[in-house]
Amino acid sequence: MTIHTDTRPTLNLIRLAHGRGLDLPAYETKGAAGMDLRAAIEDGTTLTLAPGKRALVPSGFIFEIPEGFEAQIRPRSGLAFKNGITCLNSPGTVDSDYRGEVKVLLINHGDEPFEITRGMRIAQVVIAPVTQVRVAEITEVSDTARGAGGFGSTGV
């Protein structure tokens, strides 16, 4: 008999009052990297995002991210492709020691106003490991084939 133990880290969360009735963040497919976040705006209202404008949209949840991890807030590709709606500061980092509500900073790069309603999937969150490094000041760096070649230096 094989016993399977789930060794994945746990994302603890608190549902806020305005998040009641919303689905928990969830992976929509077996191979999904990100869990969908939903808009926790007041039921029966619409948040209209005009072209070129931005809005901070509440998720209705406080995350307790495991130590050694971060939550990356990323755009949903369908919203970006179909409507020009994306996340600013993407990916947005939510540190493991942050204890406030997770909110999504959206911008409308499209040509038409975009209506956000309660429960709409507005972004995705990826939980990723973080490595903190030691910092050392040195006087020169080692040589590489690339050298100091920057933007576009390896071809188009």
Swiss-Prot record:
Cofactor: Mg(2+)
UniProt keyword annotation of Magnesium present: yes
Enzyme Commission (EC) number: 3.6.1.23
One biological process term in Gene Ontology: dUTP catabolic process
Tree of life domain: Bacteria
Molecular functions (GO terms): dUTP diphosphatase activity; magnesium ion binding
KW Metal-binding (keyword) present: yes
Top-tier EC class: hydrolase
Swiss-Prot/TrEMBL keywords: Hydrolase, Magnesium, Metal-binding, Nucleotide metabolism
Pfam family, one: dUTPase
Signal peptide residues on this chain, from the entry's feature table: none
Positions that bind substrate: R76, S77, G78, N89, T93, V94, D95, K103
Pathway: Pyrimidine metabolism; dUMP biosynthesis; dUMP from dCTP (dUTP route): step 2/2
Catalytic activity field: dUTP + H2O = dUMP + diphosphate + H(+)
InterPro entries xrefs: dUTPase, dUTPase-like, dUTPase-like_sf, dUTPase_trimeric
Family: Belongs to the dUTPase family.
Role according to the record: This enzyme is involved in nucleotide metabolism: it produces dUMP, the immediate precursor of thymidine nucleotides and it decreases the intracellular concentration of dUTP so that uracil cannot be incorporated into DNA.
NCBIfam families named among the record's database cross-references: dut, PRK00601.1
Annotated protein name in UniProt: Deoxyuridine 5'-triphosphate nucleotidohydrolase
Gene from which the chain derives: dut
